[in-house]
Amino acid sequence: MRAVTIDEFGAAPTVTEVTKPVPGPGEILVKVSHSSLNGFDGAVIYGFLKDALEHKFPVTLGKDFAGTVEAVGEGVGRTAGDRVFGVVMKPVVQDGALAEYVVVGEGYGIAAAPEGLEPAHAGALGLAGSAAVGVIDALAPQQGETVLVIGATGGVGAYAVQLAAKTGATVIATAKPGAETEFVKGLGATHVVDHTGDLAAQIRALSPGGVHAAAHLAGDPVAAAALVAAGGRLASTLGFGPEAATELDITVTSVMANPDPATLERLADAVVSGALTVPIAQTFGLDAVGQGFAAFGAGTVGKIAVTVA
């Protein structure tokens, strides 16, 4: 089968022929139709996770998948032809979703794709969406509160802005002037601040005592924490946790994406109902995925989708 792989850290992703996997007990072979790019993929390429996770080369890149069940291993309840989507969640970095087929476990990182969920949207939903759910659930914004989303134009940020706005909170999003600002406003941001300028001054002008809650998805965590009012909350996807904030009078939570079936189903239902938009900015075919990574590295708004089949 064709897959996007790297043979070593720092190598350019290329489309190569690899062996089609076979599902074992409790596993599902998914024929992938759609995927998307995430920051995790870049971290794998450049070796940023080599001390945290075991890697076995060649590594097939890609976390998000949408497609159909091709075959199942012993003890699996799904059947061939079922529409599914999710996130490849394995302890070793080797198998990924930027491939014609991927094997995943039955119990975690996979859910049924409901009617009305477009495959392209399903393929750009799992990882970033579940991370955003974790962040907003940790912050638990209330109607009338002010929530700052730092890194609002990325995949996680675009979902987080929408989820925060749905709570009735006032959302302040970071974005550059122009297209980025219009993008986050379209997602539900009430105010937009330019993170390339004096962020603290802009926040003070909007919320003099600091914001009630902040989603830290990019930039310096200490600077982000300083923008939160005393007694407020900060949730970070970048490893900033309570142990690093013992002197701060705020509650800090470190969040990792948790794409369990319930979270994936929650995201899918929100998309189908129209409560959540999948913000696909650009779409590339598998053979052009190198261009996709170049666009991702240059910075883009929303998600970069990949059509596999």
PLM feature spans:
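C-terminal hydrophobic helical "lid"/dimerization subdomain
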Residues: 1, 264-309
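Glycine-rich beta-strand-centered segment in the early N-terminal region that forms part
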Residues: 19-37, 49-90
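NAD(P)H dinucleotide-binding glycine-rich loop of Rossmann-like/cofactor-binding domains
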Residues: 54, 87-151
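Mid-domain Rossmann-like dinucleotide-binding core that forms the NAD(H)/NADP(H) cofactor-binding site
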Residues: 80, 122-197
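Glycine-rich phosphate-binding loop and adjacent beta-alpha segment
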Residues: 218-279, 308-309
